[in-house]
C-alpha cells in the first residue's frame, strides 16, 4: 500500500525547539516593544526586545542574521549585521547572542518578505536584556 511508504513527518508543521512566545508587551519598560509589535513600528526608531532563537554568519557575504523569538522560515523579527557593521563588534554576534534575550535599538524596516527587522551598525545598538 502507498500509505505504508509515505513519510507523514513531511506533512507536519515544522517548528524549532528554540522558538519562544514574544515577551508580554504590558510587562516591558516604557519605550520597549516586543517582536509582535515591531510590525506597527515600521519606519520608526525604537527598541525591540526578544530572544535570539536562530543565528547565522554567512561566510560569502560576511553578514550576520539573527531571528528573535521565531526561527526561519516563520521569523517575525530579524536583525541584520552587514559586513561593515560587523567590524564594529568585539565579539561574534551569532555565537555570543544565541539563546539570549536582547534589546535592539534602531530603525525598523521591512525586508523583501515583509518581515520587520533592524539593521545594526554598532555594538551599542544591542544590549543583553538584563543590562537594561
Predicted feature locations:
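OB-fold single-stranded nucleic acid-binding module
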Residues: 3-132
Amino acid at each position: 500500500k502507498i500509505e505504508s511508504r509515505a513519510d507523514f513527518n513531511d506533512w507536519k508543521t515544522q517548528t524549532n525547539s528554540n522558538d519562544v512566545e514574544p515577551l508580554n508587551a504590558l510587562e516591558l519598560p516604557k519605550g520597549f516593544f516586543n517582536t509582535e509589535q515591531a510590525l506597527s513600528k515600521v519606519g520608526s526608531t525604537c527598541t525591540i526586545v526578544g530572544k535570539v532563537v536562530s543565528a547565522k554568519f554567512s561566510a560569502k557575504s560576511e553578514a550576520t542574521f539573527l531571528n528573535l523569538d521565531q526561527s526561519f522560515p516563520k521569523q517575525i523579527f530579524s536583525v541584520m549585521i552587514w559586513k561593515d557593521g560587523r567590524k564594529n563588534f568585539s565579539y561574534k554576534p551569532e555565537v555570543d547572542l544565541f539563546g539570549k534575550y536582547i534589546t535592539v535599538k534602531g530603525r525598523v524596516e521591512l525586508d523583501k518578505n515583509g518581515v520587520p527587522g533592524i539593521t545594526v551598525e554598532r555594538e551599542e545598538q544591542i544590549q543583553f536584556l538584563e543590562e537594561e
